[in-house]
Amino acid sequence: MIQWIQYYWLLLVLKKYIRQHKLPVTIHSTFPMIQLHTNRNWLYFITITAPCKLSTTVNRIRRQHLHAKIILVAPNVNYSEIFEAHLELFGIVDTKQPLLMVMDELNEYLEYIFQPKLD
């Protein structure tokens, strides 16, 4: 039940950010994963807590989009299991932190990915 709440909360946060910044982003949401894509970027947010499901989901994404950015949003993150499984994650947001810190972290990732590239 908590995973569903976390998933829909994350979906609302992402939609709000996209609306505020008027980004040309397409959202596809299928629990436990939210996919955002533009012409240049593929970004996935995963809200899984079970390590076996995380590994399977990340590998499935990598087969479809090799250069996609994957962010794990979950409590109780086991960093050693992620390292041992050689999962390539763009970032990890620990939801055991206070809500404001989680929001700031999510906004930092979104700003980094969707900011205009200055050459």
Q: Predicted regions span which residues?
A:
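Short, surface-exposed basic-aromatic patches at helix termini and helix-loop junctions that form
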Residues: 19, 61-64, 85-87
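Output/docking surface of receiver
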Residues: 74-79, 83-119
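Two-component/phosphorelay signaling modules centered on CheY-like receiver
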Residues: 4-29
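Conserved phosphotransfer microenvironments
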Residues: 11, 36-70, 76-80
